[in-house]
């Protein structure tokens, strides 16, 4: 077999073994360099694999063919996501090195700086494994690898509360993972297989409409409920969002540019892969879509209100993160919206990177993030320009990528005759503009008597994010067509 045949495995193994090397270096710069080279290599081989092997690759470990052995499967949907999250981590490592040193590793023992990069790569390997594997138990293993590393990452920050937040994350994340594991056990008992494609085939043959109301179907529904409950808990979707507010509030904001930027995208992919690839959609789509839609509406109302009422800059951004999960689940519950869903997730992910990077620059200079008593930012013209553009794009104002997506959401809801959902989305969008206005007032019109700070950290990260926003706006039509093509080729 040539190297290209091993790409599905290599893109998980490279960050995994690089994490081990980082742990053995005992040197901060060397571990950073190893992590950066590993992600660049990963990005290159993924792009090379797509260009030479097309958009579908299957890999069986030890030549044990599926469904007996463990299979990795790359398709039209997960390969672009893999490229994107590799890009996010590369951004974090290249453009955020100064902010990493000032806001994260500064509060870690000097002898353990290398472990930060090791844990970062372990988390990344877990995320890539979740995206790549076609085996349900392997899927669970990678969820746990990424989760265990993430628990430690979010515990690092200037506040002691970060450790308490990480403990909340640990407890609730463990409960969520346990529910997913129980669900996998049910599926194995029902089908005798752990291969996702094989389970899908078995369920389609044995669980058609002829068994509606039977004990068999009831057992399948129980398995589905366990999985969705666990996934929703890990995603912090309302009403199980409370742990994220506590955990993220105390975490160093720059680490959230990586974690928050990809967690929603990965969580939605995880649920979509489960709903569309593992089980027969027709059996459960209507009742579960109605349930998800009701939860999404509640999330949009409550999180937009809480974001508007919050007096802390960081909490406003965190509630905004939870709010976008509501938009995502609303689109997930509407069958024709799958392409629009991934457009929303990608643009929102870029928005979150920008907002948390912006917050990291500010929190590096002051602990006071109250919108009424925050210190005035002085003599930082480039920071103010980039901050204004970041807030402009995030607020979904006209002539931004998110504004175009919101218009498409409005059109979709009208076409589907979802009047209540349309009204809720309009209200949430107005609230979104209002709480972004609160952020702008705090950043640009703070009183000088509150004190003065000057942003002197490297602004390349913010500049890169604004550049990406402008690029996505200019090529929005082409991006939408590409996402639509990839989702239709995978999901139909």
Where are these regions (language model features)?
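Predominantly late transmembrane helices and immediately cytosolic-facing juxtamembrane segments
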Residues: 238, 345-362, 367, 420-453
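Membrane-interfacial loop-to-helix junctions in multi-pass inner-membrane proteins
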Residues: 28-40, 104-122, 137-140, 158-178, ...
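Cytoplasmic/organellar membrane-interface segments at the starts of transmembrane helices
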Residues: 251, 371, 378-385, 429, ...
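Interfacial segments of multi-pass membrane proteins
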Residues: 153, 203, 248, 275, ...
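Transmembrane helix-loop-helix hairpins at membrane boundaries of multipass inner-membrane proteins
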Residues: 1-10, 17-118, 201, 480-492
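Short aromatic-rich membrane-water interface segments that cap or initiate transmembrane helices
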Residues: 2, 65-81, 204-221, 415-419
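Alpha-helical multi-pass transmembrane bundles of energy-transducing inner-membrane proteins
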Residues: 112-122, 126-216, 233, 306-370
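Short helix-boundary/re-entrant hairpin motifs in multi-pass inner-membrane proteins
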Residues: 225-291
């Amino acid at each position: 077999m040539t190297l290209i045949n091993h790409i599905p495995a290599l893109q998980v193994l490279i960050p995994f073994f690089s994490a081990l090397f980082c742990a053995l270096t005992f040197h901060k710069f060397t571990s950073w360099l190893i992590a950066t080279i590993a992600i660049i290599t990963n990005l290159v081989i993924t792009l090379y694999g797509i260009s030479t092997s097309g958009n579908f690759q299957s890999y069986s470990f030890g030549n044990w063919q599926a469904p007996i052995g463990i299979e990795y499967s790359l398709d039209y949907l997960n390969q672009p996501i893999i490229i994107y999250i590799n890009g996010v981590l590369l951004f974090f490592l290249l453009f955020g090195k100064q902010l990493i040193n000032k806001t994260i590793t500064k509060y870690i023992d000097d002898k353990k700086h290398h472990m930060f990069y090791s844990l970062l790569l372990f988390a990344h390997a877990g995320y890539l494994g979740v995206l790549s594997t076609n085996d349900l138990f392997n899927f669970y293993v990678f969820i746990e690898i990424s989760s265990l590393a993430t628990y430690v990452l979010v515990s690092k920050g200037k506040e002691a509360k970060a450790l308490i937040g990480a403990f909340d994350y640990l407890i609730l994340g463990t409960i969520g993972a346990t529910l997913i594991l129980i669900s996998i056990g049910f599926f194995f008992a029902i089908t005798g297989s752990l291969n996702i494609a094989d389970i899908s085939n078995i369920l389609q043959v044995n669980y058609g409409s002829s068994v509606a109301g039977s004990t068999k179907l009831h057992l399948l529904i129980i398995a589905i409920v366990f999985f969705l409950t666990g996934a929703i808990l890990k995603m912090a979707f309302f009403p199980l969002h409370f742990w994220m507010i506590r955990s993220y509030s105390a975490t160093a904001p720059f680490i959230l540019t990586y974690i928050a930027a990809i967690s929603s995208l990965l969580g939605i992919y995880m649920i979509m892969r489960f709903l569309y690839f593992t089980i027969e959609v027709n059996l459960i789509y209507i009742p579960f879509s109605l349930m998800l839609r009701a939860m999404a509406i509640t999330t949009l109302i409550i999180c937009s209100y809480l974001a508007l009422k919050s007096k802390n800059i960081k909490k406003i951004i965190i509630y905004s993160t939870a709010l976008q999960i509501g938009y995502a689940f609303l689109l997930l519950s509407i069958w024709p919206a799958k392409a629009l869903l991934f457009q929303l997730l990608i643009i929102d992910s870029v928005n979150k990177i920008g907002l948390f990077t912006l917050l990291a620059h500010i929190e590096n200079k002051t602990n006071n993030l109250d919108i009424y008593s925050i210190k005035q930012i002085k003599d930082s013209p480039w920071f103010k320009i980039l901050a204004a553009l970041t807030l402009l794009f995030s607020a979904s104002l006209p002539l931004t990528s998110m504004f175009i997506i919101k218009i498409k959401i409005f059109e979709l809801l009208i076409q589907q005759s979802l009047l209540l959902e349309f009204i809720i989305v309009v209200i949430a969008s107005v609230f979104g503009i209002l709480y972004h206005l609160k952020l702008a007032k705090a950043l640009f019109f703070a009183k000088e008597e509150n004190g003065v700070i000057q942003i002197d950290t490297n602004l390349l990260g913010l500049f890169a994010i604004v550049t990406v926003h402008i690029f996505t706006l200019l090529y929005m039509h082409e991006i939408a067509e590409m996402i639509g093509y990839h989702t239709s080729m995978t999901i139909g």
